């Protein structure tokens, strides 16, 4: 199994800690005036999502996580699992609700998503950065209603709620950013 020295730590690197895959968020190399140098690392556990800080002595080795990211197309949800398919091999992978998490509201059939696999099992499902969804419910925009430029809430076809400008009507398709949950533009 591959391993990394603390001198090789970079943001986004995936390592094993307590038999759980983790991703490095921040890495700070500290060389005090007296004593041995060390790395102060901020880590997010991929299974639980917990963020913690850990210090490693300079030159210490850490096992690399056997984590693979693959691009798969979202097919459907059967109530218990979300099903994805590889366009090349047509192999299907089922992800549970825990792996999908809050991203379920951004999953659109046939959109390409990034799945993080550990030991062949999906642990994180990341939707595309932008999705196009239809507005199913929103207040009508009244003429002259310009007090407060915050817009109005709109419910999308997947159940996600996004703040949209006043001119957006029911039935229109909008482009939303899945990372921030914000309205980007109207799709023509």
UniProtKB/Swiss-Prot annotation:
Top-level taxonomy: Bacteria, Pseudomonadati, Pseudomonadota, Gammaproteobacteria, Vibrionales
Question: Where is it mainly found?
Answer: cytoplasm
| Pathway linked to the protein | Protein biosynthesis; polypeptide chain elongation
Please give the HAMAP family that the UniProt record associates with this protein. Answer: EF_P (MF_00141)
What CDD domains is this protein classified in?
A: S1_EF-P_repeat_1 (cd04470), S1_EF-P_repeat_2 (cd05794)
Instruction: For this entry, list what GO says about its biological process.
Output: peptide biosynthetic process
Protein name as catalogued? Elongation factor P
* Sorted UniProt keywords: Cytoplasm, Elongation factor, Hydroxylation, Protein biosynthesis
The record, for SMART domains, names: EFP, Elong-fact-P_C
State any GO CC term: cytoplasm
Query: Using the chain's own numbering, where are the disulfide bonds?
Result: none
Q: After translation, how is this protein modified?
A: May be beta-lysylated on the epsilon-amino group of Lys-34 by the combined action of EpmA and EpmB, and then hydroxylated on the C5 position of the same residue by EpmC (if this protein is present). Lysylation is critical for the stimulatory effect of EF-P on peptide-bond formation. The lysylation moiety may extend toward the peptidyltransferase center and stabilize the terminal 3-CCA end of the tRNA. Hydroxylation of the C5 position on Lys-34 may allow additional potential stabilizing hydrogen-bond interactions with the P-tRNA.
Which positions carry N6-(3,6-diaminohexanoyl)-5-hydroxylysine? Answer: 34
Keyword match Cytoplasm: yes
Task: Name the Pfam families on file.
Answer: EFP (PF01132), EFP_N (PF08207), Elong-fact-P_C (PF09285)
């Amino acid at each position: 199994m591959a391993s990394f020295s603390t001198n090789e730590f970079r943001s986004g690197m995936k390592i094993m800690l307590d038999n759980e895959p983790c991703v490095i968020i921040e890495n700070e190399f500290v060389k005090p005036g007296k004593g041995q140098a060390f790395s102060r690392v901020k880590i997010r556990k991929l299974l639980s999502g917990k963020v913690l800080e850990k210090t490693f002595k300079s030159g210490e080795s850490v096992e690399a996580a056997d984590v693979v990211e693959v691009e798969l197309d979202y097919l459907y949800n059967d109530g218990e699992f979300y099903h994805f398919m590889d366009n090349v091999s047509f192999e299907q992978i089922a992800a549970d609700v825990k792996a999908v998490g809050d991203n379920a509201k951004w999953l659109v059939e046939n959109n390409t998503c990034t799945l993080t696999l550990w030991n062949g099992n999906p642990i994180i499902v990341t939707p595309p950065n932008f999705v196009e969804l239809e507005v199913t419910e929103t207040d009508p925009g009244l003429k002259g209603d310009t007090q407060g430029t915050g817009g109005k809430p709109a419910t999308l076809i997947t159940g996600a709620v996004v703040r949209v400008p006043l001119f957006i009507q029911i039935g229109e398709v909008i482009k939303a950013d899945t990372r921030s949950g914000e309205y980007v533009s109207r799709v023509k």
